[in-house]
């Protein structure tokens, strides 16, 4: 393996956007002497991580999955949200073979069509317009028993904003003449990604048996009761919605179960609980044999029909480094480990040759405002050791704090999170200086720079569409304006003196002065 004289580290500060408005801007109010010094001393600018620049609809806020796919692939990758919305607009969705087969089989067997997913206009993990299209398609194909299991958001949307969505779907089912909302539960339970199976089991029992902490005859009533219990959308307890006869919905042999989330990372655990025969995350009271369909590909080992299989991305940064005989390291905490590996590699699970991975466990706390530094110290310990080992040409690291603490809506905690990351960056930059290394500091999307909704006054827990920082800690250089996340991989190759493959349509942003 060849080694560069200057190993390059890419530090991705998750959820770290730039915002002129300083009100409730945790990044602005944090004491960040390291980043202040680097911005004063080195070339820096701002790049785009949202909307059309990352393959999302115009104006759509960025997110971690999308951000890392663009960062790692070096091209604008049209995201599942855009792709599926286009299929609906073009009337291709209603003819999708995987979806049609599942619905038709359930109808033929006299069974029900169960549709589950994040009922939200957030567009990060799902979109309620896709769920509506699925409900319409099921009824159009003859399904009379259509049950919607709604996971509530409050994270990529305002904390208490689900009422409009639930009311809309109540009206939709009335218009269609068939179907109803069968259950509601917060995404905190249904969409865990950190092996907290006690949470997922509550969603599983709710969907399979209608077993819930609470029962109501209407979804909006259930939501209002949750608010009375001081539960925001994300944390709504399992609530079964009964029909006119007081009965709950249950999942039975021969039914269809269609998962309408298009983002993989928070869809995997609950999917495995439904389809893996050897599943051992929790004890399942029932294991109905259903026609399970995933909207997109969640993981290579999840064996279920996929409505929209992944598009194959070749010559991503990781693959190019492998093919050029270079070494690389991917490192992050549990919460963003999939992002610096699976997503950064264009949806490939297996590491490339010469690619090492280090996973640091995220702290076991209910919400990260309780420990805003998360595991950043341990992460940095490992990262500094890796730099000093001089084993790697390229190091990709994600610090999750800005995003994970930003999502809690806790301003003071978000400030502490930013300060913790700043201190860690100082250690990383010092370690790189000792070995003649350089680094690019950027982000995948914004979050912590806006901690309150200026209109409603509610906590702002979602991502933003703000530009993100782009700092080059290295040789004297200039940085082009108007960059985007897909320019980062070509920039790294350019700094290494490597040719940029044709598949990478991004452009190098950093130009070293001779």
Swiss-Prot record:
Signal peptide: none annotated. Pathway: Carbohydrate degradation; glycolysis; pyruvate from D-glyceraldehyde 3-phosphate: step 3/5. Its cofactor is Mn(2+). Binds 2 manganese ions per subunit. Mn(2+) 2 binds at residues 14, 64, 444-445. GO terms for cellular component: cytosol. GO terms for molecular function: manganese ion binding; phosphoglycerate mutase activity. The active site is at residue 64. Mn(2+) 1 binds at residues 403, 407, 463. InterPro entries: Alkaline_phosphatase_core_sf (IPR017850), BPG-indep_PGM_N (IPR011258), Metalloenzyme (IPR006124), PGAM_B_sf (IPR036646), Pgm_bpd_ind (IPR005995). One of its GO terms (biological process) is glucose catabolic process. Keywords: Glycolysis, Isomerase, Manganese, Metal-binding. It catalyses: (2R)-2-phosphoglycerate = (2R)-3-phosphoglycerate. The keyword RNA-binding does not apply. Pfam families: iPGM_N, Metalloenzyme. Its EC number is 5.4.2.12. Substrate binds at residues 125, 155-156, 187, 193, 263-266, 336. Catalyzes the interconversion of 2-phosphoglycerate and 3-phosphoglycerate. Monomer. Belongs to the BPG-independent phosphoglycerate mutase family. This is 2,3-bisphosphoglycerate-independent phosphoglycerate mutase. It comes from Shewanella sp. (strain MR-7).
